[in-house]
UniProtKB/Swiss-Prot annotation:
Domain VASt: 372-543
Domain comment as written in the entry: GRAM domain binds phosphatidylserine in the PM and mediates protein recruitment to endoplasmic reticulum-plasma membrane contact sites (EPCS) in response to excess cholesterol in the PM. VASt (VAD1 Analog of StAR-related lipid transfer) domain, also known as ASTER (Greek for star) domain is a sterol-binding domain.
An annotated GO BP: cholesterol homeostasis
Name used for this protein in its record: Protein Aster-B
Taxonomic classification: Eukaryota, Metazoa, Chordata, Craniata, Vertebrata
Organism of provenance: Homo sapiens (Human)
Length: 738
């Protein structure tokens, strides 16, 4: 498969034709045929579809050739075609349909992406929008009535986002000097607009897409399975780390052929990388090449001399340039150095040191840039780069303690394995605890870490971690990429940069996307802030242990370092001596007043010391207590207000029922005009009179009853008083007689 890709992508291949060559395609961005205007629109019935003919004989020849070449594998492809290919055609089928529908376009135009949408005319014409590198095309077929529209990107004056019926944001308007085209019913309007705007920008700037960038867009829109065959010779596989934000410069055919041949030969002669990482020290055997005066090239495309002397000033660069031009540099080799190999090619200098511990040429530049998302960590630590790698990417006590603090459980570390492309990867499985009320309490995570083969011990490590979180809402829509870049700054200093990117497998709706990104960025910020603080604590502990060493050990280390550097005194370069001088161990004050470098500038800023962890937790607990009290008080207040509102509504309903009886007495706005209306009014008045009379009768009746009860009570009271008077008189009489 590897050889097949090389044979397909090489521009000097015997099978490539001028019409299909991607280089000639870029250089021959010729104007369209003469019978073609800036934008054309054709409407016709399907019975005239057979009249579509190529505008030029050359196009007809190219199509006939392509059809003949595709016949060889046509039967097999039809037999092996799955049922879902009929419902979801591949990119190859889409591109063939695009060429059949728009025969008036040049054959160099290749479909990049197509979208389902509608064109607004007298009615909405539902169809598909096709985007190529220089054209916007639309095709619709409604009840066998076809509509074709082609607009050249260079002729577009403006491109704006619009709303259907001034309410639904799913439309794009494209304006030329003479016409306006309103496309609506897009499923993902913003993504479509960004693609159209990018192609329009490239067309106006006359900077066409290079083949890798074009096929990168195709893979982004249609996935990895494009349905291509060996007949598609213009296919160029994009790199995994291909950046689509830059423009590709046009390369002459001769230069491209030379580059392709040289790259092919270098791939064929490249030895397989060992499972272990390449060492930092470079022996003389790797630097010398018999029969060639070219300097070997490192992983980032720079000569090894420039890479080794990078950051040491202009004088060292001049030495490396003089070495490349073949001028001899006098160097006195140490007598007891067994690594030097004296041969005919003595112009190439050997390594500056025979020990990997004495390299202080400056900060190493990473061979990959940061991800396009966000950068959370960019810090220099007083560890060697290998020490930092052991802390983060091995089953170290630091890693276990950190995962325990993050409340990770069911942790499974799989060993590092070497892949076919030379990279090394491993898988880590664990369970995390979630605090989001909309998510479950725990979720399983699968983290795949990939260390690129260009990583070197004691120099640079670049590791990508792909994190898949299961059991969370919309977990099948997205995944996370974290890029850890570890570079050497000095002998005992290294820089850690961590950048992250959120990638989508399926495009979510706007509200869902906002929910995902909000929780994603907040969770990662907390995680990496915790990681940085734990690394700072480990750094302070490590420095404290280093300070406990005896003075004899420090003196012996200093003398050994100086002895290793003595063989390089014959270079007589003052700046090199300063760079190669012994590195002193930083003190605690250096850690306390660390200076953080801002990426992309030379400015520095002071990082204040972190507060104690206990005080921080206490302040957080107090804050949570205050928030809970406020929430409880608010709930009680809401309950009281609801009760008051209920009471007022009940009183209002009671008052309304009481006043309904008085509605008949209100003066109407107009007097009755007919006899019927007068009769209805008199009838209502009579009913109201009878009702009121009945109420008064009941009131009088109840009053009479109360008066009778009062009368009876008074009579009983009077009788009681009389009986008492009678008994008292009789007793007095008896007393008198006795």
């Amino acid at each position: 498969m590897k050889g097949f890709k090389l044979s397909c992508t090489a521009s000097n291949s015997n099978r490539s034709t001028p019409a299909c060559s991607p280089i000639l395609r870029k250089r021959s961005r010729s104007p369209t045929p003469q019978n073609q205007d800036g934008d054309t629109m054709v409407e016709k019935g399907s019975d005239h579809s057979s009249d579509k003919s190529p505008s030029t004989p050359e196009q007809g020849v190219q199509r006939s050739c392509s059809s003949q070449s595709g016949r060889s594998g046509g039967k097999n492809s039809k037999k092996s075609q799955s049922w879902y290919n009929v419902l979801s055609p591949t990119y190859k089928q889409r591109n063939e349909d695009f060429r059949k529908l728009f025969k008036q376009l040049p054959d160099t135009e290749r479909l990049i992406v197509d979208y389902s949408c509608a064109l607004q005319r007298d009615i909405l014409l539902q169809g598909r929008l096709y985007l190529s590198e220089n054209w916007i095309c639309f095709y619709s077929n409604i009840f066998r009535w076809e509509t074709l529209l082609t607009v050249r990107l260079k002729d577009i004056c403006s491109m704006t986002k619009e709303k259907t019926a001034r309410l639904i944001p799913n439309a794009i308007q494209v304006c030329t000097d003479s016409e306006k085209h309103f496309f609506t019913s897009f499923g993902a309007r913003d993504r479509t607009y960004m693609m159209m705007f990018r192609l329009w920008q490239n067309a106006l700037l006359e900077k066409p897409l290079c083949p890798k960038e074009l096929w990168h867009f195709v893979h982004q829109c249609y996935g990895n399975e494009l349905g291509l065959t060996s007949d598609d010779e213009d296919y160029v596989p994009p790199d995994d780390d291909f950046n689509t934000m830059g423009y590709c410069e046009e390369i002459p055919v001769e230069e491209n052929e030379v580059n392709d041949s040289s790259s092919k030969s270098s791939i064929e002669t490249k030895p397989d990388a060992s499972p272990q990482l390449p060492k930092k020290s470079i022996t003389n055997s790797t630097l010398t090449s018999t029969g060639s005066s070219e300097a070997p090239v490192s992983f980032d495309g720079l000569p090894l001399e420039e890479e080794a002397l990078e950051g040491d000033g202009s004088l060292e660069k001049e030495l490396a340039i003089d070495n490349i031009m073949g001028e001899k540099i006098e160097m006195i080799a140490p007598v007891n150095s067994p690594s030097l190999d004296f041969n005919d090619n003595e112009d190439i200098p050997t390594e500056l040191s025979d020990s990997s511990d004495t390299h202080d040429e400056g900060e190493v530049q990473a061979f990959y840039e940061d991800l396009s998302g966000r950068q959370y960590v960019n810090e220099v630590f007083n560890f060697s780069v290998d020490k930092l790698y052991d802390l983060l990417f091995t089953n170290s006590p630091f890693q276990r303690d950190f995962m325990e603090q993050r409340r990770f459980s069911d942790i499974i570390f799989h060993p590092w394995k070497k892949e076919e492309n030379g990279n090394q990867s491993r898988v880590i499985l664990y369970t995390i605890t979630l605090t989001n009320p909309l998510a479950p309490k725990t979720a399983t995570v699968r983290e795949t870490q990939t260390m690129y083969k260009a990583s070197q011990e004691s120099e640079c490590y670049v590791i990508d971690a792909e994190v898949l979180t299961h059991d969370v809402p919309y977990h099948d829509y997205f995944y996370t990429i974290n890029r850890y870049t570890l570079t050497r700054v000095a002998r005992n200093k290294s820089r850690l940069r961590v950048s992250t990117e959120l990638r989508y497998r399926k495009q979510p709706w706007g509200l869902v996307k906002t929910f995902i990104e909000k929780n994603f960025w907040s969770g990662l910020e907390d995680y990496f802030r915790h990681l940085e603080s734990e690394l700072a604590k480990t750094e302070s502990t490590y420095l404290a242990e280093m300070h406990r060493q005896s003075p004899k050990e420090k003196a012996s280390k200093t003398t050994t370092v100086r002895r290793r550097k003595r063989p390089h005194a014959h270079l007589r370069v003052p700046h090199l001596e300063e760079v190669m001088s012994p590195v002193t161990t930083p003190t605690d004050e250096d850690v306390g007043h660390r200076i953080k470098h801002v990426a992309g500038s030379t400015q520095t800023r002071h990082i204040p010391e972190d507060t104690p962890n206990g005080f921080h937790l206490q302040s957080v607990s107090k804050l949570l207590l205050v928030i809970s009290c406020v929430i409880c008080f608010s709930l009680v207040l809401l309950v009281i207000l609801n009760m008051m509102l209920f009471y007022k509504l009940w009183m209002l309903e009671y008052t309304t029922q009481t006043l309904t009886a008085w509605q008949g007495l209100r003066l109407q706005e107009r007097l009755p005009q007919s006899q019927t209306e007068w009769a209805q009014l008199l009838e209502s008045q009579q009913k109201y009179h009878d009702t009121e009379l009945q109420k008064w009768r009941e009131i009088i009746k109840s009053s009479v009853m109360l008066l009778d009860q009062m009368k009876d009570s008074l009579i009983n009271l009077q009788n009681g008083i009389r009986s008492r008077d009678y008994t008292s008189e009789s007793e007095e009489k008896r007393n008198r007689y006795h």
